[in-house]
């Protein structure tokens, strides 16, 4: 932005030569700089905080003794994973006190390339939610799958100078970093040369490998699942983004690792969170509740949720209640439950008691529709011949993106093909961008599905079709339903569709209101658990969507076959 026209107004209002826009009285203001509570009037004008003083004002607000926090910031989120459009996502999180997010749109980029990134910039431009993009670093995530696009450093350079671009998105290709891969380092330099942040992704890295990764000036990691991992990264100068999503829930394990000495290197993030979870449990406000319940000082927790995130990603005019900063703030009842009563963005009321009170413009773009393009399949598409009964199996872990690499004696039919049973379910990935006909087939344990199939076009990160089932016929019905709807999530049994949630925007997002999407999703969850018997320890759809991501250990499945993340190479299902 250009500050000069704004400065005259700010200085005149702060100096008393002009009325301010708003004075907030009777608030307990959380001062994240001095780690204290301030009780003083707060003057706001021109969408900015002016200072702690009384002033002639166009309007006043009685906070009635509530706590006033800076607007909450999500340090790493994939908006597409909310299954709704950016405007509908904003409606969900603004109501919970989140006023800024660092969004990595690598989901839509893997489907639509630069057109998807431009859509995300255009769709968020006029929202009261401040959306900064971290340009996807790994499209495709690896060279071991087929995505809808390839984005090299030259492609990213066309958008990196946009002021709403915070930097480079999570560098999932940590083997490429360690090996000094030229394309990887070119992308990192693209952000660093502009003084922007490089976001990280380094599950399981430790010791010299982690130090090498950090030496590449990668600033963050949101893949920590233990306190030891968290502390090792902080000791290397990295920020740790403590994640509480829908499938990956790490806060309870990591919050005890927050100390007075390391708290300023912590940030909160959701990564992937679905509408029902946001509506029920909240967004970054949920992180605050969890942190405090695990003994973190409330003001420290607020600092993590605001100032730390702002400083990590270069949002220099946000993250604190201080003169000159954007007047994003939240009124909450107390510093334990953090019940959000009012939310202001740039000095304007945007949400009250859980409801957004301003119009949020939606954005339509034909470039991100009609994205399901598959070669016709027949009833042999999902056959899995095995040389013996011993097979490599993907073992699911409750509430985690990690999987186990298992070996199991599996049932086979007379022709030597795997037949689901004994707690084992068939998994397939169908390429859906260029109609290559690629179909990868594997076996999972711990999903619990019986009597049907589940399929979705949300399949990180290349977003091919992933389908799980205990019979090939229902798996085929499910894939054809996704082709019909232009993408989405579907449940099938007995040769018919039980329920579907169409996601026509890139096969990732709905064009319907968030409440409608949430209601449909809740109905489908019920069917998944009760009719198809999927384990209640598993989030059926998001868990399925991560079984295709070949950068999180240990075994994953792509459209090209079974992939061992530990060795970064393909392996066979048969042992």
Swiss-Prot record:
Keywords: Hydrolase, Manganese
Positions of transmembrane segments: none
Pfam families per the UniProt record, alphabetical: Adenine_deam_C, Amidohydro_1
Cofactor: Mn(2+)
Gene3D superfamilies tied to this protein: Metal-dependent hydrolases (3.20.20.140), Urease, subunit C, domain 1 (2.30.40.10)
NCBIfam families the record matches: ade
This protein's name: Adenine deaminase
